[in-house]
Design a protein with these regions (language model features):
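Extended interaction regions within the primary functional domain
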Residues: 3, 7, 39, 105
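Short, Lys/Arg-enriched N-terminal segments with co-localized hydrophobic residues
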Residues: 3-20
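N-terminal cationic leader/targeting segments used for protein routing and processing
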Residues: 7, 23-25, 69
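Bacterial N-terminal signal peptides
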Residues: 32-43
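Flexible loop/hinge segments at secondary-structure junctions
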Residues: 48-383
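Bacterial N-terminal signal peptides that target proteins for export
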Residues: 19-34
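N-terminal acidic, proline/glycine-rich, low-complexity intrinsically disordered segments
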Residues: 2-4, 22-24, 47-49
Length: 383
């Protein structure tokens, strides 16, 4: 692991680096009983911004046929891990704070704030979702006390924070997202490999395909689709989604100049919904009836995987990721009551119910406990 990646991994403050299972962009969540009593493989939090070994091999591989079509998705309902505690209000919570960061998490933050204020009506929490890239500077200069991010902080962002405060920011995982590749609901494409996604969106084509994919016919579609140019929708550089997709779907290559950079996650989905020949990427929580999430394969020899809950928990869906709230917490010092209780609320049963309501996946109890421990909020005995 490179020095910069060590800093990124350390910034989560969940477990020591030596406990990481291995560099893997997948969530690596084990499911003893589907979507119930979920725990991490090896009992450890494993998350890295490095590409998987499978993707690294694929980057040097020759182009292969389209990914195998997936089986029909399961209709398994998403439930809250019974080990997640309910929330109990405490005395002494007041004041006002601001949240600046991820657009992907804007709706989640709004629901969390709404639920939190039912317990503490006098509290004021303002939220601004301009992109994950706005969170680190806001935390550094103190204009925000919460920094929602749809990616881990980069090592240079951590370095700037540490240069001012002498310690690293703390990233608290709050929920699980599946970054989806969307097409219009009438598009007949069955599946895509990440190498095909790369050749569609990237001018670098580091995935291994040696030619641009510019029309739907290049992907094997016939009839009216054969000669239709693919219209590209994405996010801007301030977005954590932009960076995550660049790293994990484009093999750290550069976007094509013709990608339409939309101001938010919903704008991407709306753009695709209104453009029959479009393709775009956004969080699964923004899916609507007018678009379809295309099943994705790690490479052309692997089966394509639907963007469904059990495939994220099992680690099979290739673009699963954690969504974080970063806070400025000095080691050994307690968070103030407002920030402390908001974090506790997010990781409680009602907080995780809000996650499900927004179309994201709730944390396993094991992960929620580690997240609480990362900010010195170990669960009380009996919880």
């Amino acid at each position: 692991m490179r020095a910069g990646d060590k800093a990124v991994a350390a910034s989560t403050r969940l477990i020591p680096e030596s406990s990481l299972v291995k560099s893997n962009l997948r969530l690596r969540l084990a499911v003893p009983s589907l979507l119930a009593a979920v725990s991490f493989a090896s009992g450890a939090f494993a998350c890295s911004d490095d590409v998987t070994p499978a993707l690294q091999q694929a980057a040097g591989a020759a182009p292969a046929p389209a990914a195998k079509a997936p089986a029909a998705p399961s209709a398994q309902a998403v439930t809250i891990d019974p080990g997640i505690p309910d929330y109990q209000a405490v005395q002494g919570v007041s004041g006002s704070v601001k949240s600046i960061g991820s657009d992907t998490m804007t709706n989640e933050m709004s629901l969390w704030i709404e639920g939190f204020k039912r317990f503490y009506p006098s509290v004021e929490i303002a939220t601004e979702g301009a992109g994950s890239g706005t969170a680190p500077p806001a935390l550094i200069d103190g204009t925000a006390q919460f920094g929602p991010m749809s990616r881990l902080m980069k090592s240079d962002e951590i370095d700037k924070f540490k240069a001012k405060y002498g310690y690293e920011p703390t990233g608290v995982p709050t929920s699980i997202d599946m970054l989806a590749v969307y097409v219009h609901k009438d598009n007949p494409i069955k599946s895509l490999s990440l190498q095909q996604v790369d050749a569609i969106f990237s001018k670098s084509r580091k995935g291994g395909i040696d030619h641009d994919i510019r029309t739907w016919g290049d992907l094997g579609l016939t009839g009216e689709w054969a000669n239709k140019p693919i219209s590209l929708y994405g996010r801007n550089a301030e977005s954590g989604t932009y960076g995550y997709f660049k790293d994990h779907a484009l093999f750290k290559g550069d976007y094509k100049d013709e990608v339409k950079e939309m101001p938010g996650s919903s704008a991407v989905v709306n753009g695709v919904a209104g453009d029959k020949y479009a393709i775009g990427y956004s969080g699964i929580g923004y899916r609507t009836a007018d678009v379809r999430a295309v099943p994705l394969a790690v490479d052309a020899k692997s089966p394509a995987v639907e963007a469904v809950a059990e495939k994220a928990y099992s680690g099979d869906y290739p673009l699963g990721r954690y969504l974080y709230i970063y806070v400025n917490k000095k080691p050994g010092a307690e968070l103030d009551p407002l920030r402390r209780e908001f974090v506790r609320y997010v990781l409680s049963k009602p907080g995780q119910e809000a996650v499900v309501k927004e179309g994201y996946l709730p944390l396993p109890a094991t992960v929620a406990r580690k997240a609480l421990e990362s900010v010195d909020l170990a669960p009380k005995a009996g919880t």
